[in-house]
Amino acid sequence: MAVTLEFALPPEAAGRLARLPFVQAHRIGRARSAAAETIWSDTAEGLLCAQGLLLESPRRGKRVLRRLLPRPEAAWHPAQPPGIEAVFETDDAQPATDGAPLVALAAFTGRRQTFGLALAEGTVDAELLIGRLRSVAAESEAARLVLAGPLPAVMAAARAIAAHLPLAPPLVSLAEEARAMASGAGPRPYRLGPPDTSEASTVEDAFLRAVGHLLEVLHQQAARIRHGGEPEAVHQSRVALRRLRSVLRVFRRVVDHPDLRSLDARLREVVGSLGPARDWDVFLGGIGHHVATAFADDARIAALLRAAEARRDLAYDAAVAMVAAPGWRLLLIDALSVLLARPWRDAASGSPREALEMPARAFGRMALDRHWARLRRAGAAFETLTAEDLHELRLDGKRLRYAAEVFAPLFDGKRARRFLRRLARLQDGLGIANDVAVARGLAQALAARSAGRSWAVGVVEGWCEARVADHRGDALEAWHRLGGKDRFWTGD
């Protein structure tokens, strides 16, 4: 299987690529270098951008109508080169703009270096683009590395480079970066949120679409994790991780392989690594904030929250270091490699192989029925459940919710949205007790041998107890509202 994958490098690191021992050891002959220039154009009214397109005119070669973002329903995975809507064979051919003239929005100028790499897995053709993006109002450096060849060879090359340089799939295409620079608006990510499986026909198709989408979302969110950044980056990274792990487990009855199991274990470790940062964010933004507001002038509370902020800083040190380390880049590349290689096909034969071709809707119904039955059994005697039982019920609800998000696009949208809203309310009601339990543990971890600190911890614990009491009935009400009639996957 031959593939072409696009990666991004910081320009400074791109300048060191040729000196990398791996490249020097495997390069075929000398690298060739040539000037590179590309211009992106649109009408003054932005008619092409409104369709998610730009006209791309390279210095050499044919002009193309470049797609800025993949269509929402299209299959996608990280490092996938941006799509081409049309190729113009002659200079006078133009995209349809209702007669409006085209104007240049932004341009790339730099160098294109090409070289081959001879690996045991095969020969890889590499193309390094390094230079500057320019618009009327701004400019910035940019670099891209395109690797083409047999899949095992391309992934081996990407892995070897990423072990020593910050190579990763690009967060945006050069064309989208050019559009953002010209418009002054931020670049738009390839993918966010839950996956769109609406066009999936088979079980394997749905699996590939969901995993590819969620790998992209995870990459996008993790890239935003930084000191002083929005707490949503860590939160959404953990959500993407949980959604991705849910997909691996939900489809495991049909799509299974040791490489997928290994990937799941590595993703679980990342969830744990980001946990402390998220816990301290929730504590400081929730109960800690409410206590600080209620005791605005109390030095003991202020000291406790300063200690909490110091713990959060340490947790973010670990999170930022993790996503900047080679291990994180290699995890993304290994996950992409498994997705593209599809090793479960070789392991499947007979009925398992046929199961890969099962209609996605039929498989979705069976999977959701199993999760629904488990949730209803766990909550059958809701009023008598212990705290531990409610915690397990919350986890069952979360598993059902993530599975429902994957299959919802295959069914009636209105019914699916209602079901997910009601399930989310149940999760919120059950989650309060969990958040409070975590907050109580964090507060106790801040305890010190002083009367002031002990008093402040006691205030936080008391606040936690009061919050649980105030919301005790929310989960019960949400449970009664979530009835069997809400199951969007039943019927036609």
Per-region residue spans from a language model:
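Function-determining surface determinants
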Residues: M1-D492
